[in-house]
Structure formats: C-alpha cells, structure tokens
Amino acid sequence: MFDINLTHEQQQKAVEQIQELMAKGISSGEAIQIVAKALREIHKNDKKTPEN
C-alpha cells in the first residue's frame, strides 16, 4: 500500500462520496474501502501519464 497526498478539496470530495455511499445503506468501512480503491486507481493512472 502507498500514501496518496490529497489536497483539502480532494479530501472533502472523498468525504462527500463516502457520505453518499453511507446514505445508500453501505457501511462506513465498505464506503471508505470503495472510495480509497477509486483514489488509488486514479493515482496509479496519473503516475502512468507521461510528464511534459
């Protein structure tokens, strides 16, 4: 596992996504897992993008 540095705005968005999932009946732990996995995928894909 690795650390992802998020801006405050990105952190807020992640919290909102977790809250939305919980509002749909998903447990907090599962919601956190879902959002964390999505963030890792985004971060991994960003790392693969060639730098200009």
Curated annotation (Swiss-Prot):
InterPro entries: UPF0181. NCBIfam families: PRK05114.1. Belongs to the UPF0181 family. This is UPF0181 protein CGSHiGG_01050. It comes from Haemophilus influenzae (strain PittGG).
